[in-house]
Swiss-Prot record:
The keyword Ribosomal protein does not apply. This is Integration host factor subunit alpha. One of its GO terms (cellular component) is cytosol. Keywords: DNA recombination, DNA-binding, Transcription, Transcription regulation, Translation regulation. The keyword DNA-binding applies. NCBIfam families: himA (TIGR00987), PRK00285.1 (NF001401). InterPro entries: Hist_DNA-bd, Histone-like_DNA-bd_CS, IHF-like_DNA-bd_dom_sf, IHF_alpha.
Amino acid sequence: MSAGTLTRADIASRINQQIGLSRNESAAIVESILDHMSDALAAGQNVKISGFGTFVLRDKAQRIGRNPKTGVEVPILPRRVMTFRASQSMRARVAGK
């Protein structure tokens, strides 16, 4: 595993080691899962993975912002944002409880 960051390759390698699929098959599974999640999010669906967390989409309305250098008001356009909410069990695991 890479120091500090878990990558797609790390996940595929772990699947390869634990399940015994080939590296190519493991990488294809990882890509398929991530593609499916991305497609669902792009279609406006939230993605919930039990025991892990939920990727939540939220629509933000237009609002007025301010240029910090000039102080001039500028409109911030409406947009959709994605956040991740970790499950209770994931929060406890990360906290070491």
